[in-house]
Amino acid sequence: MSMLSCMKRDLVHHGRLAVAALVFFAGCGSSDGDDTRSYLERTLAQQFVSETSHLVTLQTYRTEDPQSEQLVVDNLARSRDYLMGLAQEFNRGQSTLKLEPFEWRRAGPTQTQWVFGFRLGSGPKKVAILAHLDTVPPGNADWRPFEPRVEARDYRGAAQPFLVGRGAADDKGPAVLALIVMRALANRYDGTNALDGLTVELLFDTSEETDFSTAYYFQEVGVPDFGIVFDAVWTVRAEKGIERPIFTVPLGAAPSNGIFIEAFNSAPGATNQIPDTVTARINGNDEAALDRLAANVADLYQQYGFDDPLYRRAPLEVSRDAKAVVLTTKVIGAQHGSVPDENRANGASPVVSLANFLAHLVDDATLAPNGVGRMLQFMAWGWGTTVFGEKHPDLLERHDQVFEQGNGTTYALTRVTTSPQDVALRIDIRYALGHHGVAWDGKTEGQLPGTSVFPDAFEQLVNRFQQDRPGQAVTVATVNAASPDVRDPQSPRFQRISGAYERAVGAPMPLAAIGGGTDAKGQVNLVAAGPLFTLAFGPPINYHGLNEGAPIEDLQLSARILYQIMLDEIANKTTR
């Protein structure tokens, strides 16, 4: 069994224990502890859903449209004002220990770099909780992403309540939990000197999905001595590197005869998000051929033999627009760009399904070759339906002692766009240690120095394609968005988190090596931990996907664990 499979099994097991621990945790502790825990429990029960729901109604996703930035900033300001109002209301009942708001902001090249939040205490040692209030785009609006509601979903074999809406799980729900924990801490230590020498800080990132404002903030004010990034799973010991290549082919002149792929476009969205739909438009001067294709293409699609006979193809819809044939495929399953393997195993990618099928129709001359067809041929040749780079393992496939086989470098082909000039493919790559230019020494914690080996690997790849399949050249430009980050699970900070987890849950803390990028990357004092207990990002959670939902019981237990971590940090505030 691969490391990833083991982690999925262990995290689900711990999730079951987590739900069972709810009653245990609520009833444990001294009489003073009971009073403070009752505040935490009461606030979780009465305010988590309503406060998160308010944030979910505010659209805070960025798009490629330059006009989206102002809308996002305006709604983030509304989010800030709402949270500040909650803090002010809470502070009225406090005598000495109050939530003190802070804000850091500056203009960036394309986006506002902005962090805000609350502090308890003012000591030189700083302990932090991080969450973010921006989200990825909602995709198809039919699922009512900004109309939060609670519904029962089957989760680990039983019906559980889920809060549904964009950001409920990533990361507005966790952000509200963090604020509830801060209020519980202030309630517990009001009128005491327990926080002397210590500052507990809650930071809300406003651009985690795109630009990581916290990184700029830390450059200016310094990194906390210890912090929990509440935006992942329990508990991240390594994050893969992130690479973002763009492959392009010139569109060229339309074929003068026959029918051809006029455009191939994924639905608007982020590169780290498998799109909910992909649409291909087929046109040409042979109307009889277009009619035949419209009549037969659904059967051809069902009969087409993908490179894996067990491959699950995305649902296809066929329509007409004037004489053109329009093909639309729809996503099934996980949509987070860091887990294309989960989508491949349990769902279907609309990009991969339609690209491979149409490349075949170009190969067999049903469709005339052009720039779009050339790009789809490159996609089918380079990756087919695979996600680990198996078609060109010498260049694309890597796994290692941290990111083991089954959890190595992944390729999510997420964005294909056709313009009047060219067709472009964007890939979300989460890469293992072997794709980095500087080897890990096996012991040093943190982000690896240097950059990836992908520029050379991709140059070899496109040259190999040109040799194997001569035709219009594919060009590539790539950006190394982040290098891998590896931690020591035996370090004191991990052991402190583990101790709090075990006291709250009654079971050992799991460890995960993930593809997702968090605010902890590059900051060795920060650990990405919680709020989820599973690496399964597809249904019913649907991380970055349609019908995103937060398992309420799991998230509330995560708040209890986070609270225990903070209690321990305050009790041992001289510990580094």
Which residues does each predicted region cover?
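Bacterial N-terminal signal peptides that target proteins for export
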Residues: 3-18
